[in-house]
UniProtKB/Swiss-Prot annotation:
Gene name tied to this protein: MXRA8
Glycosylation-annotated residues: N135, N324
Record bears the keyword Cytoplasm: yes
Keyword Signal included in the entry's annotation: yes
Top-rank taxon: Eukaryota
Bilayer topology annotation: Single-pass type I membrane protein
Entry protein name: Matrix remodeling-associated protein 8
Segments carrying motif RGD: 268-270
Residue ranges of the region described as Disordered: 309-341
Length: 463
């Protein structure tokens, strides 16, 4: 009955207290893990088994029927007037097995607290619904002189690897007018009258501490691939992995059957991507995205994959010939090969049928070449005919012009010369000189008379 009265008093003090309620947000790592945590360039030879390492212990998931988050809150006191190191005052787990140090305390009910000092039992209280409403405030029924010091409210989340702490300074005074709370720039300072109840506030209503969600529905890992030259926002999804065991495969067909992630990835926190065998077409940027919405974890690891040529294999050692004395005569063993059988590399010729568009393209090239040749031939023929026709007309014009411009004087001179030429050509061979002289007289023509036709024409014109 007395305990219920004190609990009722504690609730009234909680509602009417004028202390400042400080609520801390999500932890620093939880908000800063949205950025890229690592970026590296890896090279693998073509045909090898490529491994892109993506590991995180914060993604390890252990299934529990009670949905135990392994959360604990504990209050510590340091700097008290009694002196000595900091000491644990009280702690409380969300549910399940409770421990102090390495000692097992057994099973406790949800909201059950553990008080370490016998003098503090029944005097220090934590709200039983702390892990449901996020109120982890410490209530002290009657403040004593030894209670003065620096109190720290510590929240641990072993599953999400989170740790948060809040400090409150408690001062005990005999003056009721000095009682109150203020902020000194780093922490809350609470002054309480001796013998009066005190409420040290510690409030954190983040869902990770209030058990409002199930982690198996909010824990996912996925791999993305960016071909060379493709931005991050247009990456192709390769794999989706869920803590519930569901898996989804995407990506191009030539890569989908060669990528895999181990089946126990969530049990070990190892989500490395295996590509077996890796090919030159697999080059690009691969991203490993780790999302734990319950714990507030968002990480991305980037890998730039380069595929190199496979290393040249060393030539096989020469086989021992039968005549060098290194081989022994006898029947061949069961694993010996027949030397008459030679094994060569098999070559497969693949004939890819050409499309109809390719056929018409080649036909167009042939027709265009033929048309160009015909046009060139016609041009040559026309040019030749035009040249011949022009030469014939030129010769006709030249002959006509020569026939019109005949000089009569030159004609006369030419006629006289022609007669002389003819007389000189006559060759007579006679037996005596008398006959020769007679023949010359008979055949000799009268001397040519030069007539100037121009003068004759002028004479006729003057008459």
């Amino acid at each position: 009955m007395e305990l219920r009265a004190w609990v009722l008093l504690w609730r009234l003090v909680l509602l009417q207290s004028s202390a400042v309620l400080l609520s801390s947000g999500p932890s620093g790592p939880a908000t800063s893990d949205r950025s890229v945590v690592s970026e590296s360039t890896v090279s693998w030879a073509a045909g090898a088994r490529a491994v892109l390492r993506c590991q995180s212990p914060r993604m390890v998931w252990t299934q529990d029927r009670l949905h135990d988050r392994q959360r604990v809150v504990h209050w510590d006191l340091s700097g008290s007037k009694a002196g000595g190191p900091a000491r644990r005052l009280v702690d409380m787990y969300s549910t399940g097995e409770q421990r102090v140090g390495e000692q097992r305390l057994g099973e406790q009910r949800v909201g059950e607290q553990r008080v370490y000092e016998p003098r503090d039992r029944g005097r220090l209280l934590l709200p039983p619904s702390a892990f449901h409403d996020g109120n982890f405030s410490l209530f002290i029924r009657a403040v004593e002189e030894t209670d003065e010091g620096l109190y720290t409210c510590n929240l641990h989340h072993h599953y999400c690897h989170l740790y948060e702490s809040l400090a409150v300074s408690l001062e005990v005074t005999d003056d009721p007018r000095a009682a109150g709370a203020h902020w000194d720039g780093e922490k809350e300072v609470l002054a309480v009258e001796r013998g009066a109840p005190a409420l040290l506030t510690c409030v954190n209503r983040a869902h990770v501490w209030t058990d409002r969600h199930l982690e198996e529905a909010q824990q996912v890992v996925h791999w993305d691939r960016q071909p060379p030259g493709v931005p991050h926002d247009r990456a192709d999804r390769l794999l989706d992995l869920y803590a519930s065991g569901e898996r989804r495969a995407y990506g191009p067909p030539f890569l989908r059957d060669r990528v895999a992630v181990e089946a126990d990835a969530f049990a070990r926190g190892d989500f490395s991507l295996l590509i077996d065998p890796v090919e030159p077409a697999d080059e690009g940027t691969y991203s490993c995205h780790l999302h734990h919405h319950y714990c507030g974890l968002h990480e991305r690891r980037v890998f730039h994959l380069r595929v190199t040529e496979p290393a040249a294999r060393p030539p096989p050692p020469p086989r021992d010939s039968p005549g060098n004395g290194s081989s022994h005569s006898g029947a061949p063993g069961p694993g010996a090969r027949d030397p008459t059988l030679t094994r060569g590399r098999s070559v497969i010729n693949v004939i890819v049928p050409e499309g109809r568009a390719h056929f018409f393209q080649q036909l167009g090239y042939v027709l265009a070449t033929l048309l160009l040749f015909i046009l060139l031939l016609i041009t040559v023929v026309l040019a030749t005919r035009q040249r011949r026709r022009g030469g014939y007309e030129y010769s006709n014009k030249k002959s006509k012009s020569k026939g019109k411009d005949i000089n009569m004087a030159e004609f006369a001179v030419a006629s006289g010369d022609q007669s002389l030429y003819r007389s000189e050509d006559i060759r007579l061979d006679y037996k005596n000189n008398i006959l020769k002289e007679r023949a010359e007289v008979a055949h000799s023509l009268p001397p040519a008379k030069n007539i100037d036709l121009d003068k004759e024409f002028r004479k006729e014109y003057c008459k």
